[in-house]
Amino acid sequence: IYRKHLKYIGATSPGELCNESYVAGVGTYPEDIGLEGLSMVITQLIGLHIGLTYDDVDNCSCPRAPCIMQPEALSSSGMKTFSNCSVHDYTHYASKLDMQCLGDLSNVLQPKQSVCGNGIVEGSEECDCGNETECQFKECCNHETCKLKGSAQCGSGTCCTPKCELSAAGTPCRKAVDPECDFTEYCDGSSSHCVPDTFALDGHLCRLGSAYCYNGRCQALNDQCVSLFGKGSQGASYACFEKVNSQRENLANCDSKNSYSLPCGQKDVLCGKLACFRPNKNYKSSTQSVLYSYVHGSVCLSIPPGLSMRSDGKDNAYVADGTVCGPQMYCINGSCKEVNFTGNDCNAAKKCKGNGICNNFGHCQCFPDYRPPDCNLQIGSPGGSIDDGNLLRTDSALATKRLSQHADSWVILGFFIFLPFIMTLFLGIIKRNERKIVPQKEQER
């Protein structure tokens, strides 16, 4: 439950973990704490539920203060541990019969059975190309049994060829959708499925430092306007955003998750509905409803919510998450938040030696001629990371590449060495033939 002002962190039934009538709890999400603080709220509620109590700071201690079951833990950052009092409480509670339900495995949920035909390889399935209509690998995979046919190596996936063979290692299987914030993934030669998506760590600077990468895309305000209103449109001024997002009307909303009107607070004006300058003075939209606002002699464009939805459920009428809203700040869920890097330990300058950037797995995405995982110099390396599936950066592959390059170089060098010799020989033959022809003509005279 979200609460703007904190009066309590939640409610649960202390020590009633195995009581089916009370095995529940409710936690609050105060405005002034981040995800780390919320995780402590949940941890403390679970602790109370299994019989722990709040620590007495005078009698309880832990290796690094504050301890988990202390109220101060909600507002502090960094690793935390349980105190000696919490360990004692748990040992005492676990020794009683009140926790015997934890040893009862009769009600453990069984893994979901695989469903043949849903396009997802599960359980004992060898392949799953979808139902009869969807299956594009009918020569490779039996869509009714999800078993491979004959000698087929694969029967589904982006790294499976029409000949039922695994794609060669290094074959691109997912192209980058953004030149700065997303990366191409490759088949690894051993799986028919592409590796998980890799992209720049959220908060990485793009567009010459004017925007942030977020979820694999450079969230530049101008790009969002171009996608809605066409080439030439640009992000509007602060005055336009204030006009569009501060009025109390049905179409002024800083919270796209709710159906009611919620004008933006002053600090969140740039994170509400998207406001853009028109591409040109004669701009008219024939494909969608456009709202026109006039501010200080400028025309600001916006659209009503719900008319331009993305495949991920987000509404293009609103500023995208990750868009800059101030110095070291970007928009998250309609609010202007400080860019927070406390959740990752990847420092590109140190970990990648300045020869790459951090990706969403916290690993280095190296520039060309630098080899992962540490981005050490290696001429000929395609760069990338240990996560993108490209195995063609191994020592043997690079050695083969260099030998091939050297062989080509020797062929070219040999050609240029022997070319003058061949030309000299050819010219000599021509001269000799000319000398033979001249005496014959003199004898004929």
Curated annotation (Swiss-Prot):
<dbReference type="InterPro" id="IPR036436">
    <property type="entry name" value="Disintegrin_dom_sf"/>
</dbReference>
<keyword id="KW-1015">Disulfide bond</keyword>
<dbReference type="Pfam" id="PF08516">
    <property type="entry name" value="ADAM_CR"/>
</dbReference>
<feature type="topological domain" description="Cytoplasmic">
    <location>
        <begin position="431"/>
        <end position="445"/>
    </location>
</feature>
<feature type="disulfide bond">
    <location>
        <begin position="366"/>
        <end position="375"/>
    </location>
</feature>
<dbReference type="InterPro" id="IPR018358">
    <property type="entry name" value="Disintegrin_CS"/>
</dbReference>
<keyword id="KW-0812">Transmembrane</keyword>
<dbReference type="Pfam" id="PF01421">
    <property type="entry name" value="Reprolysin"/>
</dbReference>
<feature type="domain" description="Peptidase M12B">
    <location>
        <begin position="1"/>
        <end position="106"/>
    </location>
</feature>
<keyword id="KW-0325">Glycoprotein</keyword>
<keyword id="KW-0245">EGF-like domain</keyword>
<feature type="glycosylation site" description="N-linked (GlcNAc...) asparagine">
    <location>
        <position position="59"/>
    </location>
</feature>
<feature type="glycosylation site" description="N-linked (GlcNAc...) asparagine">
    <location>
        <position position="19"/>
    </location>
</feature>
<feature type="domain" description="EGF-like">
    <location>
        <begin position="342"/>
        <end position="376"/>
    </location>
</feature>
<feature type="transmembrane region" description="Helical">
    <location>
        <begin position="410"/>
        <end position="430"/>
    </location>
</feature>
<dbReference type="InterPro" id="IPR000742">
    <property type="entry name" value="EGF-like_dom"/>
</dbReference>
<protein>
    <recommendedName>
        <fullName>Disintegrin and metalloproteinase domain-containing protein 18</fullName>
    </recommendedName>
</protein>
<feature type="glycosylation site" description="N-linked (GlcNAc...) asparagine">
    <location>
        <position position="333"/>
    </location>
</feature>
<dbReference type="InterPro" id="IPR001590">
    <property type="entry name" value="Peptidase_M12B"/>
</dbReference>
<dbReference type="GO" id="GO:0030154">
    <property type="term" value="P:cell differentiation"/>
</dbReference>
<feature type="domain" description="Disintegrin">
    <location>
        <begin position="113"/>
        <end position="202"/>
    </location>
</feature>
<dbReference type="GO" id="GO:0007283">
    <property type="term" value="P:spermatogenesis"/>
</dbReference>
<keyword id="KW-1133">Transmembrane helix</keyword>
<feature type="glycosylation site" description="N-linked (GlcNAc...) asparagine">
    <location>
        <position position="340"/>
    </location>
</feature>
<feature type="disulfide bond">
    <location>
        <begin position="62"/>
        <end position="67"/>
    </location>
</feature>
<feature type="disulfide bond">
    <location>
        <begin position="18"/>
        <end position="101"/>
    </location>
</feature>
<feature type="glycosylation site" description="N-linked (GlcNAc...) asparagine">
    <location>
        <position position="84"/>
    </location>
</feature>
<feature type="disulfide bond">
    <location>
        <begin position="346"/>
        <end position="358"/>
    </location>
</feature>
<dbReference type="Pfam" id="PF00200">
    <property type="entry name" value="Disintegrin"/>
</dbReference>
<dbReference type="GO" id="GO:0006508">
    <property type="term" value="P:proteolysis"/>
</dbReference>
<dbReference type="InterPro" id="IPR001762">
    <property type="entry name" value="Disintegrin_dom"/>
</dbReference>
<keyword id="KW-0217">Developmental protein</keyword>
<comment type="function">
    <text>Sperm surface membrane protein that may be involved in spermatogenesis and fertilization. This is a non catalytic metalloprotease-like protein.</text>
</comment>
<feature type="disulfide bond">
    <location>
        <begin position="173"/>
        <end position="194"/>
    </location>
</feature>
<dbReference type="InterPro" id="IPR006586">
    <property type="entry name" value="ADAM_Cys-rich"/>
</dbReference>
<feature type="glycosylation site" description="N-linked (GlcNAc...) asparagine">
    <location>
        <position position="131"/>
    </location>
</feature>
<keyword id="KW-0472">Membrane</keyword>
<dbReference type="GO" id="GO:0004222">
    <property type="term" value="F:metalloendopeptidase activity"/>
</dbReference>
<feature type="disulfide bond">
    <location>
        <begin position="60"/>
        <end position="85"/>
    </location>
</feature>
<dbReference type="GO" id="GO:0016020">
    <property type="term" value="C:membrane"/>
</dbReference>
<keyword id="KW-0221">Differentiation</keyword>
<feature type="topological domain" description="Extracellular">
    <location>
        <begin position="1"/>
        <end position="409"/>
    </location>
</feature>
